[in-house]
Amino acid sequence: GLNISLVHTDSIPLMSFLFKPFTSVLPQNFQYFGIWILLSTFLQSIFAYKTMKIFSKDVFICSVTTLFFLFAPIFYMRIFAQPAIGSQWLLIAALYLYLSPNTNYKRWFILSFFALMINGYLFAMVFGIYIAFVIKELMEKNINFTKLSLLIFGKFFFSLLLMWIVGYFSVGTGIQEGGFGFYKMNLNSFFDPMALYELHSRIMPDLPS
């Protein structure tokens, strides 16, 4: 084996756990990434449309704006190279919950569960939007500071428990991997993405280095 937790292989643990019971009947070369790409594309459009419906009830306007989410270049740059990180519908769903007037905390916990079972990076982003939502609730006087603390720390410890169960804290010792120093982020990367193979922006071109 690889002697490393599944969550560190970018293999979408949610799908792995779903198909694990059927290992004996599935082909040896079976993979679920194509299924996930199709599902992510569908969910990307669904949550984009639901988010747009908050701002407009016009079906045509919502449909057209949904296309911008569905055909966003950054979505296709990631979904085929890294299907787990390409699950950007999680972020759109989080924004929908933030903006929706009928959001309840059960939906946030469900979304966080799926995010953790898909990709840790996306979970961190979803958690950040959740914190912003809870602070907004406090500012609108829908909750008090005590409930805010319970909602944030309760979700934090629930997430830690789930991360421990799934294997986020399991680090193997048998794998040697390179890339350190190459896959790094300079402090000016917010202004200079330093694209390796293409120009990311004509407005803000790469800085000389």
Q: What is the predicted role of each segment?
A:
Residues 12-16, 58, 178, 182-185:
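Coil-to-alpha-helix initiation sites in intrinsically disordered, low-complexity, charged segments
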Residues 140-150:
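Membrane-interface helix-loop-helix junctions at transmembrane boundaries of multi-pass membrane enzymes
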Residues 162-209:
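Periplasmic/ER-lumenal interhelical loops and adjacent helix-loop junctions
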Residues 2-7, 119, 201-209:
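Short aromatic-rich membrane-water interface segments that cap or initiate transmembrane helices
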Residues 28, 77, 138-142, 167-176:
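Transmembrane helix-loop junctions in multipass membrane proteins, especially transporters and channels
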Residues 1-43, 72-87, 191-197:
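Membrane-interface coil-to-helix junctions
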Residues 38, 42-55, 60-137, 155-159, ...:
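Membrane-embedded helix bundles of polyisoprenyl
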